[in-house]
């Protein structure tokens, strides 16, 4: 992706993400269940299909947080060989990479006797790539905060409840380590009050990242809306 001095190479599929998915399928599959692992390559996505079901207590919704050990020694070996992230952090890493590349996070679906993990090829937000790069130039962010910023950047505005749902968190307190530093550091703005409060990337970050995405009245400050109305009335006096 090139825009003036800004340039970032975005692969169709990040090798770390694919490697993590394949290693996960090998390490976390139930070997008491027969069947092969399938890697299905389509023009717009890659699927890794695993025989068996997710470990007890793990669901497609809580897979970002919930860890249940299965084939522990195999997992430790793959981690020691640097083939995969330590147990419990693989999906965090994949979320970070996908969002930093302006793509959707991996999706997981559970069938009757198999689990399918899917990564999409399509970039859904080029602008969010620049937003995250600009934010990392001005602040040191943890993985959780990069993930949260990526989700916010891919949306014009988003509520805390929507973030909680996307991240499968318990409540607003659980969201704090993901979100609060972004607001405190001025990377994200909070608009509204209480339950109607929404979050968006700050105007300074958008400006410095040379944001060229679509903008609606939600993103324009009140004083700018007033100026636009006055200017419009000057042009169209008869109105």
Which role does the model predict for each range below?
Residues 1-239:
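C-terminal regulatory or interaction extensions
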């Amino acid at each position: 992706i090139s825009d003036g001095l800004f340039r970032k190479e975005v692969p169709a599929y990040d090798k770390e993400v694919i490697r993590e998915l394949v290693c996960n399928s090998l390490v976390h599959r139930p070997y008491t269940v027969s069947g092969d692992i399938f890697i299905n390559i389509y023009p717009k996505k890659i699927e890794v299909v695993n025989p068996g079901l997710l470990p007890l207590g793990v669901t497609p919704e809580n897979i970002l947080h919930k860890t249940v050990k299965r084939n522990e020694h195999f997992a430790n070996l793959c981690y020691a060989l640097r083939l995969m992230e330590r147990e419990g952090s693989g999906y965090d890493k994949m979320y970070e990479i996908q969002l930093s590349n302006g793509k959707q996070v991996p999706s997981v679906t559970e069938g009757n006797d198999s689990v399918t993990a899917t990564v999409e090829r399509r970039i859904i937000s080029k602008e969010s790539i620049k937003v995250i790069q600009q934010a990392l130039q001005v602040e040191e962010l943890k993985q959780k905060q990069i993930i949260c910023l990526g989700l916010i950047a891919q949306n014009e505005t988003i509520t805390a409840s929507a973030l909680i749902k996307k991240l499968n968190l318990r409540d607003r307190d659980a969201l704090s380590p993901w979100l609060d530093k972004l607001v405190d550091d001025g990377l994200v703005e909070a608009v509204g009050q209480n339950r109607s409060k929404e979050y968006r990337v700050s105007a300074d970050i958008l400006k410095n990242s040379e944001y060229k995405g679509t903008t609606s009245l939600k993103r324009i400050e009140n004083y700018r809306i007033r100026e636009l109305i006055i200017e419009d009335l000057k042009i169209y006096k008869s109105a």
